[in-house]
Amino acid sequence: MQFIFFGTLFSGLLLVCAVTNDIEDASGETPGIVSQITEEQPHQRQKLYNWDYKDLGTIAFEDIPFPTLQPSQTIDQSENCPEGWIRYSDSCYWVETELLGFAKAERKCSEKQSTLFVANSIDEWEAIRGHSKDSFSSWIGLVRFSHYERSEQLPRWQTEGAVNPSKINWLIKPYSPLVNGWSQLANCAASYKSPASLETASYTYFYPCTYLFYSICERNSTIANSLH
Ligand SMILES: *[C@@H]1O[C@H](CO)[C@@H](O)[C@H](O)[C@H]1NC(C)=O
């Protein structure tokens, strides 16, 4: 009985696939247009970010396509941040509590017109990492790419003007990549927030970028509005 059921289901799936293929074939130009958009879009990202889709395509990352850029509106957060966001200076921050790999976390921020959290001062770093969820690690916008390993000792923040990464709370100080978990397969930095009673036990460490963590997004109005 079960066997027959699965048999029917399977041929049903085959039929669906066949129909879908027919539709795609019939739609002529569409696939061409789609690939054109996905090829152009990373180029626009390069102006703003310290890394782009080519870096994200290395083995330690998931190679996922980015959404098409929305026609962006001017962001005015001089008064308030959107509901659920945290405010610090001219930036708004979103604590993402869906468990995501680094590349998906970055994309999720991008969909909210934000980047992963980049600290422009140690005060900002302390204030914002303190809002991430207790006893969890959260992705931040800090990566040491294997292909820059020879030329760069320090990891790269996602946007310009950030603090010297060696000054933040690495697990092992003074900072060096290897003692803090970095390897060819562990490029992405995450901030671990210890429970409040053990605050000094919070730290930053490198992990494989495919690990599933929380994440912190930052929408810096200066950066967001420099896009247009
Ligand atoms: C926002 O970005 C600008 C330009 O990089 C920077 O000077 C400023 O410190 C940032 N503000 C915050 C709160 O991150």
From Swiss-Prot:
Keywords, comma-separated and alphabetical: Disulfide bond, Glycoprotein, Lectin, Proteoglycan, Signal
GO BP terms in the entry: immune response
Any one Gene Ontology molecular-function term assigned to this protein's record: carbohydrate binding
Endpoints of the signal sequence: 1-18
SUPFAM superfamilies the record matches: C-type lectin-like
Disulfide bond residue pairs: 109-217, 188-209
Glycan attachment positions: 27, 220
Keyword Disulfide bond in record: yes
InterPro entries on file: C-type_lectin-like, C-type_lectin-like/link_sf, C-type_Lectin_Receptor_IMM, CTDL_fold
Domain C-type lectin: 88-218
UniProt xrefs under PANTHER family: CD209 ANTIGEN-LIKE PROTEIN C-LIKE, KILLER CELL LECTIN-LIKE RECEPTOR SUBFAMILY F MEMBER 2
Protein name: C-type lectin domain-containing protein 88
Organism: Caenorhabditis elegans
